[in-house]
């Protein structure tokens, strides 16, 4: 195998580090931006819905609220304050949040209570209905809320409509709970708005263009619409036959126009049926299915009700008031147009019921002119859908994984809701099932009302309540976190009731937590966790495991399956393995598994060594509710706090010296949030599963996490080892805990340390510097990044690796931003990556990593890779151990790495070093293996034959061993039980490969073989080690507790250590592992530094090296030195010397310490070992491609979700704008109604004027007088400046509508005839003029977009606008459209006037808008003095084009 060049390797490692740091920072920013956007989205949504409800109150002008009160309330809503619920509810917020969450998740109970409340004639029933929609279900922004609300509607159909004597009358009345909720839902549903806009925009605009006359079809009403003078002029003498005939002719003309108009609406309805909202269709089909079963209800009656629901409650309101739904925005609808729209709606309803109901004869003539099945066909499509039980999603869920964690509700709404529920339950009218459910809910709610006095106890309420209640059965990534900032989540509505309106103070909306816990955000998983998941998946063989099965979720949204239901997925995956050993798991995970670790640990449970075991675990994924609760308690480390641990040996699980620290960390208030985030990290791991397309549970290998941390390096460990008053026995216990299973304990320890940012020793773990505080942020970043990589596969157990594991946890603590960021990604988690890697190498990786230039010879299959990490001495031994390592790479690696790492990490003089290494060995071995380790002669040299002979039999004895172990404390069980076996075929293949090779170095150690190959130092080391082994042997019986094994249990697999598939693998753990560790111990001066440790530190040094400082070595030197050469002279040391010189020159003390430590470790290896280290680093670099892919996908997912949230925010802002403008329009209408006399006088005066200037002056004067009156009106006292401007525009539109005919055609028939002449001229031109006509001279480059239909559409609607300002804006939009299309055609140049005017002329010819000359005259008369800037420029171009068209001779 060709050894990679150290310069190239260093270059690639540095590039990788820089890229990863950059991605992490970007992801962190994206996460922060995402939360801000979500917060703004929910806040805006809440306000917008309240504005809409306030608008409805204004339209109804009911007795409960005057227009002035509505306006005042609108002002208050704009200043709404969002405050955390605890500020008003105090510690009782949790109880209220639980109540609301459980109520929200019980649609049946809500429907039953609403129906019962209406039967009791509760005064606040309607306000409670609004609260349910706006607060409990948050306006259905989230699809989960939409699904719940659809279920509420379904139950309302069953409980309310089905039980009613006359359901149709109840529905038409519009005041029942079903009608109100359906209206609120359909108005806010975005897919419904899309359908209405697509269906109604074009026909309504066409109607506005042609709104000259009322389309009245009743002769009597038609006559009444004209004054006597007009009747005489139009129809002749009243009572004559000519009069009657002319009236009938006009009626028939109106009928023909109306039929054409209605047919246009029906055509658009049919064309857009495909985009009819699925959720509304589901409601209609549920109604039809439910009511069809009611005795006494004919199918025709049920169909009529469905028609009422669709047309009367959904489509027709949008037809009559399109501006209220945003269908028409800038085109005013005058009285004539409104009447015609009402006629269209009436006819549509009649047509829908044709054949099912008898209509009066007067309408028969109209209906006979239509295709009788036209509307019925549309209804059949909607009603005919299969009535499935599960509500459909209205659209693709782009926010999967994001979930609401709070509700918005005012205090009065909350009390009103509770009062309503208590009244309902006291009425005895609820069904028994619902009554009991409601009683259980209300039992948790405080009876006394919380007062403001609770404001003094804000901090007594936990900011983040752990998800321990049934309400938290789904822990999802909160879009909006429950931080002190006013996160918004749902809207509450009943601010509508007058008593709630506080005239002088803005409303306070309580942000009440639903009780769900915090979760990890995407992209925050450590490198180790990602690699572990990848490797665990690889260990399953070539058969991919469907992650969607593991998580019970579709695997479509990779980016956010990450965030969604992370904890839930993990808990399911853990359930089987963990349920048996909660104590071990909770201990190991306790404070140690902060972000990333907990993830891999928690998820690791089911990851078996072979696919069959994994599938078996999956089959049992569904656990009882209690199991779920237990799992979650474990995740939040609440079981320990609550005394719920069911493992009697917990005290033994943690060594005496460490237990205090570990448990203490559980209760350490300073890291509560860190731990919660850590747990969230677990969730993220789940998410990662999706990102990597790996099986979730398999990806989350417990071992991976714990491995990352190393015992020797944790702060706690060091003090405990060196404590002068510590008994030897206790030290040995600790040592034992550190080794083997003890490695778990180490992991735990390290994690704990990492969880406390202030604890010195983090940096010690990586060997970078003495304390974490001393290390600059960048150094920590490097360390965290590298630990996993260093270890790559090997570093899992190394101290840095362990630290890296801690890294993520550490990150959750308050250190600097970059630190915490890196920690979150915890690249240092080598352990996890290590452990998993073995599997990856032999399995097909889900993401093929790019080939790094460094790895020229590192390709190849298992064969090539094994030699990289294994020494020739352990060929046979390794075969079995290696196999197991692959089956449960994490655990195995941990045990191994912890052995070696421990031996390497501690000075020989430190008794803890020997104790630890030996204990680890002992933990790792079972039966003869343990004896061999304790026995000096055997431990000094394990024979390959012994190892290999041990491999196969152990496989068979695994199950028996496991059973025998179950009754023992876990620290006494064979370590083997903690490791799952690899699939048998895989093992055999490995074994064959190993046998084929002459040497295989242990994957994680620099291998040294038997004493025959040991140098004099090694022999001496063996002698020294033998003494310690004897000491340990004597103390073994007393060895009681060990921390959870680093690789095994930190994962949260507590007992799974023994019972999960990994246990077997660990049992079979290779003597080869032990051999390595023994040999390492045997050579304290030459081999004491573990292979992984050296590799980890070397990676740190290389990834921070500057290319300028690369030493210039000859090719021969670089290719390695002969074995007899002094280790000091190997090429890595030479390279590091140059780096050290640079560090000294720069006086970078931290870097100097790192490089010196790395040189100390590396100098112990010969050139051959150095070559293998470099090859291993290169291979690790290649395998980290999956981590890069993870970061990339997280970034893409966050960006996509951010874009979707931005779009949602745009929709909400648009809804808010539409509601506000329509509110202003209604207020203006009320104002003008009070000024009707003045307006009538103004119109009469205007008719008398003849000069255009006089008319313009009078219009301006009258408008100004109305503006002044508005300013004095009480309704407008609280209006904002923007509202006043909108009001002035609305007043102008209304007044100009009233005088439009007088102002537009001052010369009446003469103007009309003039326009008709030009219209005919243009009509002839359009037949002969083409885009390439010589008279136009349109440049050829712009002809590809001809005939510019969008611009033609814009100008055709100019007749729909009645004010000069609106007509100018219409012309402006047409010109802008043309310029955009021209720019699109030629992107290399900006179109000028010479390019634009010919196209404008062509568009006007083809569009041929009516009344073109009158339009020019109207704008020139009433708006010319206000034309400035862009408007003036485009108006000049427009008039020039019209003049040019008049000069074109159509005959030529």
Curated annotation (Swiss-Prot):
Q: Where is the composition biased (Low complexity)?
A: 588-601, 898-911, 936-946
Renumbered to this chain, region (Disordered) spans 445-471, 571-611, 735-816, 885-912, 929-974, 1037-1063
Site label Arginine finger, positions: 172
Q: Which compartments does it reside in? A: Membrane; Endosome
Which InterPro entries does the record match to this protein? Answer: DUF5601, RasGAP_dom, Rho_GTPase_activation_prot, VPS9, Vps9-like, VPS9_dom_sf
Using the record's annotation, list all stretches that form the Ras-GAP domain. Answer: 147-385
Instruction: Tell me the Gene Ontology biological-process terms attached to this UniProt entry.
Output: endocytosis; regulation of protein transport
Q: What is the name of this protein?
A: GTPase-activating protein and VPS9 domain-containing protein 1
